[in-house]
Curated annotation (Swiss-Prot):
Origin species: Neisseria meningitidis serogroup B (strain ATCC BAA-335 / MC58)
Subunit description: Homohexamer.
Entry keyword annotation includes Membrane: yes
Enzyme superclass (EC): lyase
Family note: Belongs to the UbiD family.
Membrane topology: Peripheral membrane protein
Substrates-to-products reaction catalysed: a 4-hydroxy-3-(all-trans-polyprenyl)benzoate + H(+) = a 2-(all-trans-polyprenyl)phenol + CO2
Essential cofactor(s): prenylated FMN; Mn(2+)
Keywords assigned: Cell membrane, Decarboxylase, Flavoprotein, FMN, Lyase, Manganese, Membrane, Metal-binding, Ubiquinone biosynthesis
Active site: 292 (proton donor)
Protein's recorded name: 3-octaprenyl-4-hydroxybenzoate carboxy-lyase
InterPro entries: UbiD, UbiD-like_C, UbiD-like_N, UbiD_bacteria, UbiD_Rift_dom
Listed GO MF terms: 3-octaprenyl-4-hydroxybenzoate carboxy-lyase activity; metal ion binding
Amino acid sequence: MKYKDLRDFIAMLEQQGKLKRVAHPISPYLEMTEIADRVLRAEGPALLFENPIKPDGTRYGYPVLANLFGTPERVAMGMGADSVSKLREIGQTLAYLKEPEPPKGIKDAFSKLPLLKDIWSMAPNVVKNAPCQEIVWEGEDVDLYQLPIQHCWPEDVAPLVTWGLTVTRGPHKKRQNLGIYRQQLIGKNKLIMRWLSHRGGALDYQEFRKLNPDTPYPVAVVLGCDPATILGAVTPVPDTLSEYQFAGLLRGSRTELVKCIGNDLQVPARAEIVLEGVIHPNETALEGPYGDHTGYYNEQDYFPVFTVERITMRENPIYHSTYTGKPPDEPAVLGVALNEVFVPLLQKQFPEITDFYLPPEGCSYRMAVVSMKKQYAGHAKRVMMGCWSFLRQFMYTKFIIVVDDDVNVRDWKEVIWAVTTRMDPVRDTVLVENTPIDYLDFASPVSGLGGKMGLDATNKWPGETDREWGRVIKKDPAVTAKIDGIWEELGL
């Protein structure tokens, strides 16, 4: 099923009993987090809060959509897949696009033509009139306090925009970048843009500043659009492909865009709400603290201020929001689903990898478990280094455990068995110092710089040990088959 906009997706979820409308008055201050957290942990439906209320008890004018991607199945639906397992096919497509192989012959070349044709036919379609510009607030009418922006945790410093798709463009790029960066509300037309220095939006901004140090930098933030575009912004799309183009591929139809009223950036035409504005040179503000996906409040730091010059929206717009906290939360669920996309990407580069798993308890990306077909001494260490360096998404992964392909990486009992029986803590532990680390990781000795640990829990080969290696106990297949045949008679 393909969805042309967020409302289309909501309608399908509701039809299938996967969305619940909440008519009771609920406050964005803490209450929505409490409800959404309980529902997510119970693997419950998406939530549409129809009557969000302000601190004075009056009603906001717009409903709030929460827990949209609260199950891996809904993530798969949003990406146009029939099931979570089908996400591997999307990963295979991305792997091919990242490093296309020369055709092995005429037949192979023709077999690839439909995919390539589909991709390049998915260039966005720019329209002149769009639903997202049905209502326009400008000048003094711009008031972010009229939006039901969620205040997620008791010690959060202020309300926080959490699901905004930030649209930027570098000075030498035709391709626009989509990124999701949290934004602290500090005034009726002011948000703090918390993007880390390595992220696409920050890189675009830095390049612009070098060439135009005294010129305001145009930015747009999209709140609520079709699921393919939202999920395209968190998927490792090859640099040669725009997120809008990838969203069209997922959706099976071109992404409709419209030019912003106040700048040349293009935004999804059927988005619910769009914030247009600029970042003025050298205007920064102290951001945080906020509770984040680690389950802790993070430290404060200075980030650019986004001045909102214009708010455009659909008639009766829906505000899309989430919270982040100790796993499981929505980012952790997204990690579980997108894990299936990552596997083919890694296997393209390292065919010896048989499976890859990001445990949700590891805050989406901080720990990975990899299984492989080991072929030589030191092979596991090569795979560790490859995982850390191949995809930007794993640059901040602190721990990698490598096991043989007889171990199920998604079963902690098996992983712990391999670690405790196939590892020597000194010989098989790899420590790397002074590597890039998530700014939110307060455990690192220096902000943004810390260590990594690799655990080689594979069987050891000659050159790695001189000792006789243990043989795994296996049952006799004939006896197993015999007992299977009489099991019901035994009454056990």
